[in-house]
Amino acid sequence: MKAVVINQYGSKEVLEEAEVTLPKLSEHQVLVKEYATSINPIDWKLREGYLKQMFDWSFPIILGWDVAGVITEVGSQVTDWQVGDKVFARPETTRFGTYAEVTIVDDHLLAKIPETISL
């Protein structure tokens, strides 16, 4: 999948588009096709290296930890969500963030987007 990643810490110039492989979906996770994400202070602080002692991840790192989209796949133990559900989420803070075409989210971190809100 395509994602915006960093391969080193630095200014906005270190952001680059790359092909990335996500880890496998676990039994309590869903795959979300992204329609929107956001830029928050944690994103630029991590990109510039201010949080590297707290999050000791290997590169590449996909930034972003907010998403709105549609579920395209569910793990084997997911019971409250199904393919096609429109959702908001604040995924776990991992090196696989939301500046990407799709993202993996634990099922307990999802919220349903009301039908009155379009994507």
Stretches found by the model and what they are:
Residues 1-2:
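Extreme N-terminal starter segment of soluble prokaryotic enzymes
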Residues 6, 47, 72-73, 104-105:
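Short beta-strand-to-turn element immediately C-terminal to the catalytic PLP-Schiff-base lysine
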Residues 10-15, 41, 79:
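Short N-terminal binding/cap micro-motifs at the start of the first secondary-structure element
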Residues 11-17, 50-53:
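Short gly/ser/thr-rich secondary-structure transition/capping motifs
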Residues 17-22, 68-70, 102-104, 110:
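Conserved hydrophobic/aromatic beta-strand scaffold that supports enzyme active sites
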Residues 21-38, 51-94:
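Glycine-rich beta-strand-centered segment in the early N-terminal region that forms part
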Residues 42-48:
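Cytochrome P450 core scaffold surrounding the K-helix E-X-X-R motif
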Residues 80, 90-119:
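NAD(P)H dinucleotide-binding glycine-rich loop of Rossmann-like/cofactor-binding domains
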